[in-house]
Curated annotation (Swiss-Prot):
<comment type="pathway">
    <text>Glycan biosynthesis; glycogen biosynthesis.</text>
</comment>
<dbReference type="Pfam" id="PF22019">
    <property type="entry name" value="GlgB_N"/>
</dbReference>
<feature type="active site" description="Proton donor">
    <location>
        <position position="458"/>
    </location>
</feature>
<comment type="similarity">
    <text>Belongs to the glycosyl hydrolase 13 family. GlgB subfamily.</text>
</comment>
<dbReference type="GO" id="GO:0005978">
    <property type="term" value="P:glycogen biosynthetic process"/>
</dbReference>
<dbReference type="Pfam" id="PF02806">
    <property type="entry name" value="Alpha-amylase_C"/>
</dbReference>
<dbReference type="InterPro" id="IPR006407">
    <property type="entry name" value="GlgB"/>
</dbReference>
<dbReference type="InterPro" id="IPR017853">
    <property type="entry name" value="Glycoside_hydrolase_SF"/>
</dbReference>
<keyword id="KW-0808">Transferase</keyword>
<protein>
    <recommendedName>
        <fullName>1,4-alpha-glucan branching enzyme GlgB</fullName>
        <ecNumber>2.4.1.18</ecNumber>
    </recommendedName>
</protein>
<keyword id="KW-0328">Glycosyltransferase</keyword>
<dbReference type="InterPro" id="IPR054169">
    <property type="entry name" value="GlgB_N"/>
</dbReference>
<keyword id="KW-0321">Glycogen metabolism</keyword>
<dbReference type="InterPro" id="IPR013780">
    <property type="entry name" value="Glyco_hydro_b"/>
</dbReference>
<keyword id="KW-0320">Glycogen biosynthesis</keyword>
<comment type="subunit">
    <text>Monomer.</text>
</comment>
<dbReference type="InterPro" id="IPR037439">
    <property type="entry name" value="Branching_enzy"/>
</dbReference>
Amino acid sequence: MSVLPDRQVINQLISGHYGDPFSILGMHETSQGLQICALLPDAREVWLVETENGRRIAQLTLEDPRGFFIAQLTRRKKSFRYQFAVTWQESPQIIEDPYRFGPLLQDIDSWLLAEGTHLRPYERLGAHLMSLDGVSGVSFAVWAPNAQRVSVVGDFNFWDGRRHPMRLRRENGIWELFLPGIEAGQLYKFEIIDCHGQVRLKADPYAFEAQMRPETASLISPLPDVVKSSAARQKANDLCSPVSIYEVHLGSWRRHTDNNFWLSYRELADQLVEYVKYMGFTHVELLPINEHPFDGSWGYQPLGLYAPTRRYGTPEDFKAFVAKFHQAGINVILDWVPGHFPSDEHGLSTFDGTALYEYADPREGYHQDWNTLIYNYGRNEVRNYLAGNAFYWMERFGIDALRIDAVASMIYRDYSRAEGQWVPNYYGGRENLEAIAFLRYTNKTIGVERPGSVTMAEESTDFPGVTLPPDIGGLGFNYKWNMGWMHDTLNYMQCDPVHRKYHHNLMTFGMLYAYTENFILPLSHDEVVHGKRSILDRMPGDAWQKFANLRAYYAFMWAHPGKKLLFMGCEFAQGREWNFETSLDWHLLDDENGWHSGVQRLVRDLNHCYRQYAPLYEWDYQPAGFEWLVVDDHENSVFAFLRRDAEGHELIAISNFTPVPRYHYRVGIPQGGHYREVLNSDSAFYCGSNLGNQGGIDSHHVRSHNHEHSLLLTLPPLATIYLLREN
């Protein structure tokens, strides 16, 4: 190295356009001794201080009035630990030199990150509080392989990109820098000069905390500690366990009445946990809580995948929120969106001037329905970013399951595209092979590294093997939403009862494919928005019939094979559509004897009944666990089926979807005995007409429906009853 760097290099360094700052700045061993260079704009005087003894060794010479300093130590040949004593305006300040520290990434991390198989990329990329060579500070690392220069900017350096340019690791395109003295809570971003020479200010893709919109900076935040799973939580996710999910949007479940402001994570932990437990749900599912810029996206257009949104508090608050559910014996599911991201300038879009995280061709990389960008699943680093994020939420916050949004839009290249608007895969097909490989890898990794944690697919097509293991050609999900069942049964329920006999098969068709996947029956947020009306408002008839229809439908659903999901507000029959900008209509429950309270009591009892009786859940995915008893009585719109568990216990569900009571209705049954009526949706307790079977009934040795025994029943109008065979 020459005594004085080339003037052009100094100009580039000062102007923030030099891509290799470590080759100039810091201490370097030369043939003429040690050379120390520093770029300290606005500094009046700089001294080199030996850390070991605090002695001032030499004063650096100001070679350029814009802040470039240099010193030459001809008598010393070996590098040593040092600091700078800098005088800015008046008093001197002792500072560490970021450019005296060596490379941060280990070779194994560099290899795994480039390969896309690093299990925990969030432990290496992003911003991490640490101590290096006895000095406290923060290590920064960001992937931007096509950038000309990347700097860390923040409150600590006046957002000046000249002050802290980063080191490029050319083997993987990662820029890194350790900044001494930086503390938790400080704001930062990455200032990038992209491949076109344009300056971009980007939030950290791996930030653990971020500012709330409309601000866009990242915050220095410690990596959350590992949360271990438990045998009870793992068992609660099992295919043979009762799974009843309460789907919640945290920003509108309940709000402060005085200013309509959100409840915090801590406030929700006190109120929501108690309510979910009271209602008997086994799981709570949260609409996405990743940081997102637009409230109206409900979280489904996230930019800060690793940061819980600041709308409701800090990462520590969210972690305490999850822990409170676990203490109550309730598992937590997180809606996760690896399918697309918004094009906001501070986010992932054209991160280093190229289509880095997204596909370059808009026929692959632009989602025209949502005006968002689609991740490039063919890039190792992008797959690693996403797969690592899935594991992050489970390992660091104790999330028990992920529900993956819009899987169909990921696995089909022609999703919502006309002919000529999409690019076929390598073999000329419509499947996105890279996305399929990503989903298989992620699901398999979670299964191996986080046993008992599960994934759930919102997949709206008939793509085969969604819940089959990747090793035999499946996608590897544990559960799949049954969108077909939901649409068919809601269409049936919307029919006037007099016309239902013409649509009888809508309620039975789901059993023809019920065992092709591990299905969840969802009545989700998507069914109570965009003019679809509330579930209650879709029911036909006058007010009494609407509520009776809804109660009968819920009871039919809870008895049907498949796990259950219900969106908030539906449990007490909210009459209007969901509005994310205001609280649910809790005032509807003010009348304890009102219809809304009746529906709420029914859902609570359905959950407790569901959890109490194993026939309702244990063999959800075994054909032996279900038997039609009455499947073809379309004239009376009656359905009857039997649920069975592994020990032979049996429960019969019978639904009458007309307002006409059916007296002396005979149903054939496999085994005779006494059958106790354990639930009746027409009970007066639920504001029904209180017609039923006086608590139970004995079977008759009368052949019916191909069985030697039968029950002679009273079927209430627009109602479902459960009958449990007692040994």
